[in-house]
């Protein structure tokens, strides 16, 4: 893990097109701003983890056999084609 120190108004650059800037530090909370292309998905870790857990639970409720899994794979493939 890379650990960096930044002051208010200072940034770090990730890759060629993502900037993370420290906007405010108050009461033990750091407010950051992120500038990134619209195709880069950005989530708070706790939200990402909750959604992933819900997705796993939903799939386990839907998939009862290998045939169910094959069908789900085909459905998802078709959904992605139509995007």
Swiss-Prot record:
Keywords for the protein's UniProt record, in alphabetical order: Bacterial flagellum biogenesis, Cytoplasm, Repressor, RNA-binding, Translation regulation
Subcellular location: Cytoplasm
RNA-binding keyword on record: yes
UniProt key word RNA-binding: yes
Membrane-traversing stretches: none
Gene3D superfamilies: Translational regulator CsrA (2.60.40.4380)
Predominant localisation class: cytoplasm
Pfam families: CsrA (PF02599)
GO cellular component, one term: cytosol
GO biological process, one term: mRNA catabolic process
Record GO terms (molecular function): mRNA 5'-UTR binding
Record's function text: A translational regulator that binds mRNA to regulate translation initiation and/or mRNA stability. Usually binds in the 5'-UTR at or near the Shine-Dalgarno sequence preventing ribosome-binding, thus repressing translation. Its main target seems to be the major flagellin gene, while its function is anatagonized by FliW.
Subunit structure: Homodimer; the beta-strands of each monomer intercalate to form a hydrophobic core, while the alpha-helices form wings that extend away from the core.
Family indicated by similarity: Belongs to the CsrA/RsmA family.
NCBIfam families: csrA (TIGR00202), PRK01712.1 (NF002469)
Name this polypeptide is given: Translational regulator CsrA
Protein species of origin: Fervidobacterium nodosum (strain ATCC 35602 / DSM 5306 / Rt17-B1)
Highest classification ranks of the organism: Bacteria, Thermotogati, Thermotogota, Thermotogae, Thermotogales
């Amino acid at each position: 893990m890379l650990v960096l120190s930044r002051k208010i108004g200072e940034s770090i650059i990730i890759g060629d097109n993502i900037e993370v800037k420290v906007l405010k530090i108050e009461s033990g909370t750091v407010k950051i701003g992120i500038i990134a292309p619209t195709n880069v998905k950005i989530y708070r870790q706790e939200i990402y983890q909750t959604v992933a857990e819900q997705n796993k639970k939903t799939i386990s409720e839907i998939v009862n056999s290998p045939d169910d899994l094959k069908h789900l794979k085909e459905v998802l493939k078709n959904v992605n084609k139509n995007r």
